[in-house]
Amino acid sequence: SEYSLNVAQLLLTKYILLEDRKINVQNALNRIIELGSIPIVNENDTVSIDELELEMGENDSLAANVAVLANADLLIIMSDIEGLFDKDPHKYDDAELIPVVPEITEEIKAIAGGAGSSLGTGGMATKIKAAEICKNGGIDLIIMNGRDPRHLYKVFENKPIGTLFTANGEV
């Protein structure tokens, strides 16, 4: 690849959360990482009928659950929005990015209700749900704009980018 990185794609469904299937996903993730590859996880839309029935795919929660299964330190959700704003940035020019969320409060959930992404169907509310899953699993989560891959460098250099949801309430 252009960056000399190997990736492996995992196509999963919500049924990975069943106890008898978790171990298979954990083993696959561990093996991918042992081989020095980067796991790329997505919902398997070809077999997931829930998406058709609900008219909404939900990769954010799936990613959070996989992060918990993998005992990850951090989950990065890349979107076309910079992170969580104090109000919908598509409607309000004065919307301000919230850089750190130490606790997911009802106010945070209410703010997220109106700030959707134009990519995918989950919007910000599903990203907050994913942040809750991560927090319960002891994992930090960052929501950031993924249109520029150089943004990842800021994460790796511990520079602020997007919105950081902390697992333990500390930065």
Task: For each feature predicted by the language model, list its residue ranges.
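C-terminal catalytic "cap/lid" subdomain
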Residues: S1-V171
